[in-house]
Each structure stands twice: as structure tokens, then as C-alpha cells.
């Protein structure tokens, strides 16, 4: 294990990063090194998401609960057993419905294959210098990943869109109807509570809702400006855009079946299975890997 981890981290072994948050990862030299990182950081392999949590999401999706559909309107009928089979195929979780407890497991090989497909879509839009939209419902963890992608696409000549900046969005939460403000940080859309600090100070609110991306895309259309050729993100940003016919790619955990259903039905282009709630710096090797694969490294 030390060989690939030493390659991954450059000067220090990955366990030192786990002990010291200020440590940095500079390069990813191989898929073997990235596979080791995925397992060491628990981005894949046994992940923090519980089997119970995932099964609950599958049941709610089968019942077409909008909290779990997050913008996807499935064309096919999906029951819980169908979803378990789909997630076993897409993520590598257990396909046995009798397995009802413990940690979910993501196959790192599936993550690597999906990261390559993700990079191919980035490379394609960069080659034609297309307009792109990036948004996240996981800003605390994933803002850095998307911001680096936005920076690289911008440097390649893509227009990074920021429509509806400051627009209010009413989102139903478990606490009732809440109003959020649309904001952009380094080209990445997110929502904030109205009393949150301005850009760059607070990372924004966690949200699964597709309403922000619908608001953003409607504003872009109303203004007569550019529409995105590619939407990059997670949760409702991917599902909401894909359902409206925009090419969308993103990241998803094992308790987010909507993105994988969208991919299976053709509404979403690429979904990368991984734990979407580990420490933000653990995504840096993925960023480097994806940008290298997409020929966007600076």
C-alpha cells in the first residue's frame, strides 16, 4: 500500500494527510494511486453511508417522493428491488435485498471508469469552447472540486455562466418553506440563507432541490443569453438540468438513486459513484485526475 500512496502524495504518505489537515496532495500519477486514495479516504470501498439510509432512499424513490426524485421524472416504473439492482450495477453496492444493515460499499473500479467518462465530457465541451454551468448542493465538501473545474474550463475558452445571481428561491425543507438566495463562488452556483455572509465567506447551504437550477436556466433563457452546453454538479443541479434536456454530469452517493436512474434512462450523461460528504481536501486528487484526463491541467 505504501508504494501507490507515496506516488499519490508526493512528499508524504497519505496517512500523514489524514493526521494533519494542512497537508496537501500535489499529484496523482496513476489510476493505481487514485484507487488507493479512494479506498484510504473512504470515497469508495466501505463508505460512511449506511445501508439502512440507502434502502430508505430507494423506497422513497419507488414511491415517487419528490424529496428523493430531486428533479427526475422517471419514464420507467422503479420498485425497490429494481433500484437495488441498478445501484449494484452502477455503484457496486450489495444486490441482495436481504442485506439491510452496515456500511454501503462502492466499487472503486466503477468510480474510476465514471471519472474517465466525466473527464471525456469536460474535454469535449472544452474543445468546442462551449458554455457551461456548474452548481452544487454540497458546497461545504465539493465547492473546491467544482471551482477547479470551472477555472480550467474558463482557461480553455469556455464561458462559465452565472445567471440569476442574487435571485430568491423558495425551497421546501423538513423545517417548512425556506427562502434562499442564489449566489456564485468562483463560477459555481449555490444557495445561501438570506442572513448568510457574502461570497467567499460562507460556503452556502446544503440542498437537494432542483429549483435552483430551474431558476438559473429560466433566467438564462429569459435574458436571451447563452444556455449551457454542459451542466456539472450534483443532486438537483444534475437531475433538474437533465430532466429539462441539458447534458448533465455529476457526482452521487449510494443514497442518491435519482442521478443513477437519470443516467439509466438517458436524462443524465455521466454519474460518478462516490461518498459525497468526506473532507473537502480529499477530493483534490480526483480534481487533478479528471483535469489531466480531460487535457485541462494548467
Feature-to-residue mapping (PLM):
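Metallocofactor- and cofactor-centric catalytic cores in central/energy metabolism, strongly enriched
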Residues: 5, 10-137
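Amphipathic coiled-coil/heptad-repeat helices and related helical stalk/stem segments
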Residues: 115-118, 209, 213, 234
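C-terminal functional extensions of proteins
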Residues: 226, 244-298
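Anion (oxyanion) recognition and catalysis
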Residues: 126, 154, 242
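Glycine-rich phosphate-binding loop
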Residues: 217-252
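Short phosphate-binding/catalytic loops that engage adenosine nucleotides
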Residues: 130, 158-159, 246
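Long, charge-dense
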Residues: 145-212
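Gly/Ser/Thr-rich loops at beta-strand to alpha-helix junctions
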Residues: 135-147, 234-240, 255-256
Amino acid at each position: 500500500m505504501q508504494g501507490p500512496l507515496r506516488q499519490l502524495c508526493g512528499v508524504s504518505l497519505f496517512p500523514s494527510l489524514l493526521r494533519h489537515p494542512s497537508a496537501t496532495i500535489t499529484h496523482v500519477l496513476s489510476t493505481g494511486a487514485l484507487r488507493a486514495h479512494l479506498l484510504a479516504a473512504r470515497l469508495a470501498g466501505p463508505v460512511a453511508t449506511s445501508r439502512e439510509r440507502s434502502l430508505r432512499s430507494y423506497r422513497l424513490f419507488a414511491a415517487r417522493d419528490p424529496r428523493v426524485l430531486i428533479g427526475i421524472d422517471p419514464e420507467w416504473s422503479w420498485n425497490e428491488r429494481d433500484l437495488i439492482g441498478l445501484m449494484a450495477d452502477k455503484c457496486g453496492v450489495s444486490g441482495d435485498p436481504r442485506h439491510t444493515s452496515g456500511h454501503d460499499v462502492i466499487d472503486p473500479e466503477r468510480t474510476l471508469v465514471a471519472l474517465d467518462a466525466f473527464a471525456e465530457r469536460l474535454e469535449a465541451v472544452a474543445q468546442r469552447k462551449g458554455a457551461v454551468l456548474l452548481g452544487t448542493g454540497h458546497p461545504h465538501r465539493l465547492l473546491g472540486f467544482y471551482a477547479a473545474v470551472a477555472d480550467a474550463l474558463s482557461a480553455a475558452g469556455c464561458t462559465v455562466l452565472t445567471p440569476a445571481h442574487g435571485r430568491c428561491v423558495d425551497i421546501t425543507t423538513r423545517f417548512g418553506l425556506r427562502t434562499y438566495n442564489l449566489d456564485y463562488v468562483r463560477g459555481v452556483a449555490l444557495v445561501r440563507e438570506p442572513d448568510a455572509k457574502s461570497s467567499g465567506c460562507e460556503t452556502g447551504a446544503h440542498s437537494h432541490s432542483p429549483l435552483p437550477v430551474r431558476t438559473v436556466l429560466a433566467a438564462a433563457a429569459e435574458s436571451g443569453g447563452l444556455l449551457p452546453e454542459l451542466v456539472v454538479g450534483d443532486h438537483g443541479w444534475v437531475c433538474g438540468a437533465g430532466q429539462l434536456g441539458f447534458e448533465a454530469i455529476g457526482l452521487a452517493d449510494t443514497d442518491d438513486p435519482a442521478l443513477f436512474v437519470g443516467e439509466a434512462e438517458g436524462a443524465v450523461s455521466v454519474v460518478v459513484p462516490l461518498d459525497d460528504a468526506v473532507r473537502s481536501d480529499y477530493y483534490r486528487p480526483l480534481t487533478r485526475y479528471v483535469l489531466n484526463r480531460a487535457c485541462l491541467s494548467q
